[in-house]
Curated annotation (Swiss-Prot):
Keywords: Acyltransferase, Cytoplasm, Fatty acid biosynthesis, Fatty acid metabolism, Lipid biosynthesis, Lipid metabolism, Multifunctional enzyme, Transferase. It holds the Pfam family ACP_syn_III. The lineage of its organism: Bacteria, Bacillati, Cyanobacteriota, Cyanophyceae, Oscillatoriophycideae. Belongs to the thiolase-like superfamily. FabH family. GO terms for molecular function: 3-oxoacyl-[acyl-carrier-protein] synthase activity; beta-ketoacyl-acyl-carrier-protein synthase III activity. Catalyzes the condensation reaction of fatty acid synthesis by the addition to an acyl acceptor of two carbons from malonyl-ACP. Catalyzes the first condensation reaction which initiates fatty acid synthesis and may therefore play a role in governing the total rate of fatty acid production. Possesses both acetoacetyl-ACP synthase and acetyl transacylase activities. Its substrate specificity determines the biosynthesis of branched-chain and/or straight-chain of fatty acids. Pathway: Lipid metabolism; fatty acid biosynthesis. This is Beta-ketoacyl-[acyl-carrier-protein] synthase III.
């Protein structure tokens, strides 16, 4: 059987129309623009209002990616949505499939928090390499504003909403060069959006649990320690599998969590700042959307050129992490 390669042939993104900057946040919690920027690098974030949804953002980002790739929705074989904040707990990918008019596409959600997009990328690539599908649409989208405690300045300053998408296509030359994924459930409590059960008696002798999800909780110091250790290791392992030296990288594309984290990982890998893609100043941490959103911006700005080699890494709740080395088509 002839080996089937994988290429990324298009990208797209979408952000909500409502903006919340640090000055406005200082009216909600005890903080300041200087405090937030010095600790996170974030200046503002975009937030979904009642007229928008995860589905609407994801659909908009997908259409932009399809347009760039010159592919119609009817050509899509598979849609994978990476999200932790679906419009419907049963899944949102199928609704996106319907909105796009991608009738023949199989569609499903995956949940790996801020690592989700890279897990989706690796998953989609396997369907192509196995000869099952030709065109795979990958979407990373999250609306974390739904689950933020807006009175907790440790977390409310960090998160924003958004969506990003890329299109994978089978090709003769393989542009997905290497990857490394990891999980560590022993540190699950460091970053969580937990279900809080409430007891409800439905009949004598029968009690069920009907509760809701609690706002995002995070141990920032432990997450930082985990990322600075695991992410450089994952990137180095992925580079080894790709047989590429680190100095051959054109770009480092990390999950846009915190500028301190981006700087620390780049320093560990001896990657100069001019090779580090960062847009979290304008969007904050958009979870699964952050990598495709940042990628789409630099592609459309003309910074990323055909043939550029990119090391992408996502990390977050689970705890989970992943790194992918790919070449822009």
């Amino acid at each position: 059987m002839t080996n089937i390669g994988v290429s990324i042939i298009g990208s797209g993104s979408a952000i909500p129309k409502t903006s919340l900057d640090n000055q406005q946040l200082s009216q909600i919690v005890e903080t300041s623009d200087e405090w937030i920027i010095s600790r996170t690098g974030i200046n503002k974030r975009q937030l979904v209002d009642t007229t928008e949804s995860l589905c609407s953002l994801a659909t908009q980002a997908s259409l932009a990616a399809l347009n760039q790739a010159n592919i119609t929705p009817k050509d899509i074989d598979l849609i994978i949505l990476a999200t932790s904040t679906p419009d419907d707990l049963f899944g949102t990918a199928c609704k996106i499939q319907w909105e796009l008019g991608a009738q023949k596409a199989v569609a499903f959600d995956i949940t790996v928090a801020c690592s989700g997009f890279l897990f989706a990328l690796v998953t989609g690539a396997q369907f192509i390499r196995n000869g099952v599908y030709q065109n795979v649409l990958l979407i990373g989208a999250d609306i974390l504003s739904r689950w933020v405690d807006w009175e907790d300045r440790r977390t409310c300053v960090l998160f924003g909403d958004g969506a990003g998408a890329v299109l994978l296509q089978a090709s003769e030359s393989d542009r997905l060069l290497g990857f490394e994924l990891g999980s560590d459930g022993s540190q699950n409590s460091c970053l969580s959006l937990s279900y809080q059960p409430q007891e409800k008696r439905i009949i004598e002798g029968v009690t069920v649990s009907q509760g809701t999800y609690q706002p995002i909780a995070m141990n920032g110091k432990e997450v930082y320690r985990f990322v600075v250790q695991k992410v450089p290791e994952a990137i180095e392992k992925a580079l080894l599998k790709a047989n590429i030296d680190i100095d051959k990288l054109d770009w480092l594309l990390l999950h846009q969590a915190n500028q301190r984290i981006l700087d620390a990982v780049a320093n560990r890998l001896n990657i100069p700042p001019e090779k580090v893609i960062s847009n979290l100043r304008n969007y904050g941490n958009t979870s699964a959307a952050s990598i495709p959103l940042a990628l789409d911006e630099v592609v459309r700005e003309g910074l990323v050129k055909s043939g550029d080699i990119i090391a992408a890494s996502g990390f977050g709740a689970g705890l989970s992490w992943g790194a992918v080395i790919f070449q822009w088509n």
